[in-house]
Amino acid sequence: MTNIKIDHNIKFTTATVGCFLRIPLSKKNLALATLLATMQSNASALYPGIRKQTMALDKLYDAQLDIFPEVYGNQIIMQYVMNFVEPNQILDPDYNYQKVIDIFFDIIDNPLLDKTLMKLAQNQLKEEYESFYDIPANLAYKEFLESWYRQQPQYGSQLFGSIEDLENATVEDIQNFFNEMKKAPSICLGQAIDPDAMTDYLQPYLTAAGFEKEFKVTDLVIEAKEDPIEKVAPHRSLQGQILIGYGYGQKLERRLRQFGGLFLSHYLAGDESSKLFTEVREELGAAYGVEAVDYFNNSLFLVSSSIDKNKYSEVEKIIVDSVKEVQAGIVDQEVFEKSKKALKRIYLEAPDRQGIEIVQMLTNSLRGRETTFEDRVKAVEEFSSEQMIEFAKTLFMNERYYLV
């Protein structure tokens, strides 16, 4: 059975259609996926030039086509997503689902794989890479991950992939990668006012072998291996970066694992009234940025801060003590309730953002379940501070990284 799911669009004036292809995460795969996505975003065999491809999309009343790879745990999802005005909003008899879908597949099924376009994309990406990692916080995260996954280097890059593979790729490499990608597990997702018509128009294009393969992944999450490390790296910037990474196990009950880190991240650093913000400012008298993020698919709870290089030990102590406090069962109920309200608001507002709806369809397809935003709101309402404490107790400090 072909992997396709088009939901009924009942609230937006624009429709969305996307093809998603799943391949294993490795630095080389991510580099080639990034390069291919950049090339396809620029031009295609039927629209051989940036201007020609842009004009083709403009004629569809400024349709937007986004092509990019994204890392989900141990997988890369190559995403081809088009957002376009619903035909019933336009008084143009020549503008319809069929025309939009034809152009969508004209572009994504027919890449222009030549040396000139590839060199342009490589230069673009090299410039983006250097600019992105010139920012200390981005560089610190990159090096933190490489250290975290030092025993599993295939997982050590979440963006760009290997710069060496990206720079050294040949046209033949990209052609082979594109051919292999067509065999990868794939799914077509979307939202349209007339989902049946959209499905009928899409079906003839979904002939690649991957659309018949199971898209769901049973072991998407990368297990955190307990192997503590501390690393200090010098840097020329005035501010330093500190990253404290905690691992946690995969055997937690699903809801506890899914929402424990989410609640803890908001509790510690969700806004300026959260624990870390107030404690850092009270003790150090400075408005340093503090961030706590739960990387659910990586079994990684990460707390990071941009700091005065002379105060990183004080900031580290505050971070570590704040986590230990929760592990000891000490929770500020007022801050916890604020976190609950903030998370509930996020899920209540999510259905009004079309892009988030498609992301939910994708994550549900990857995990093989149907979780709605209503389910998430209910889970947040029922989640207790005792459960957050239970989650915190499973954390083990696995890496301290300092960019100073």
Model-predicted segments: where are they?
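Catalytic Zn2+-binding segment of zinc metalloproteases
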Residues: 41-47
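Cytochrome P450
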Residues: 22-29, 47, 69-73
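Extreme N-terminal starter segment of soluble prokaryotic enzymes
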Residues: 1-4
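A generic structural motif
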Residues: 22-25, 41, 84-90, 248-252, ...
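His/Glu-based metal-binding/catalytic segments typifying zinc-dependent metallopeptidases
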Residues: 6-33, 37, 212-274
